[in-house]
Amino acid sequence: MKHLLTLMEFAPHEVEYLLRVSREFKTRFLAGEIYTPLFPGRVLILYFEKHSTRTRLSLTSAAAQLGIQAVYTTPNELQIARGETVADTMRVISRYAAAVAARVYKHETLEEMARHSAIPVINALSDKHHPLQALADALTLWERAGRLHNVKIAFVGDVSNNVATSLAIIGAKLGWEVRLVGPKQLWNQRLVDELAEDAAKTGARIYFTDSINEVAGVDGVYTDVWVSMGFEKEAEERRRLLKPYQVNQRVMEIAGKKAVFLHCLPAHRGEEVTDDVIDGPQSAVWDQAENRMHTAKAVLAYLLK
């Protein structure tokens, strides 16, 4: 059974295939083409422990375009809130649906779901990984930079979070140079070590740096919120630590005119990014958000084929 828990388990050619299918789906969508639903009568369960805008709506829209009915639920609506096990819950869901997309606090919950599932489990965000976001990031950079490989991207800010991790993974699969720009306290050198094998095969370069000047010459500058869901107690400390890594006009000037600005959203305007950047001519965040839908279609089609 093939799941999408992280992109680590996907070979470089599989990642590239997903992106090419995503681009084809987008081309057909923008042309207004109405095509025969690929999976009529199938059901996708959206099991979400956390709030969501883009992930929930992109998956729901993607499913509808493929002929799949998306059913949204939360733990509080299920017997799991009263003590039913994850294992038993997944055994039941497997009888009703063709796939389940889960947005969870702990990545271990996803792993347990997959162990007891007879259907594909899709990571719709966990504390460690956000593979659906990374696929949309890659599609956006491909569109803007004009190439799928040999892309240079700088992730600025909380380089330890799930979005940065998944960006590094997909970069290793596609032969990118991924510069993780942030304070040394947040570096995860083990991630670089884990990606070394893929990087050696694809020619990728993944590294950490605390110098904001490392954004120079990149194809994209990427940031995310400084206080992710679940880290509210550390809010003030994180803001103090990450303040030097705000993406503002000065940072974009260092990056250069060809660099696009990326953000997975929602943005805390005035914190990790200034209004003039996210609303400026180099911003690609709305294309990036749209691409969540097209890459979700590719993932669903690949896992359900």
UniProtKB/Swiss-Prot annotation:
Swiss-Prot/TrEMBL GO biological process terms: arginine biosynthetic process via ornithine; citrulline biosynthetic process; L-arginine biosynthetic process
Q: Which UniProt keywords apply?
A: Amino-acid biosynthesis, Arginine biosynthesis, Cytoplasm, Transferase
Q: Where in the cell is it found?
A: Cytoplasm
User: Which reaction(s) are listed as its catalytic activity?
Assistant: carbamoyl phosphate + L-ornithine = L-citrulline + phosphate + H(+)
Task: Give the GO cellular component terms, alphabetically.
Answer: cytoplasm
Chain sites annotated for binding L-ornithine: 162, 224, 228-229
In the record, the note on similarity to other proteins reads: Belongs to the aspartate/ornithine carbamoyltransferase superfamily. OTCase family.
Protein role = Reversibly catalyzes the transfer of the carbamoyl group from carbamoyl phosphate (CP) to the N(epsilon) atom of ornithine (ORN) to produce L-citrulline.
- Tell me the protein's name: Ornithine carbamoyltransferase
Organism, as annotated: Pyrobaculum aerophilum (strain ATCC 51768 / DSM 7523 / JCM 9630 / CIP 104966 / NBRC 100827 / IM2)
Q: Which gene encodes it?
A: argF
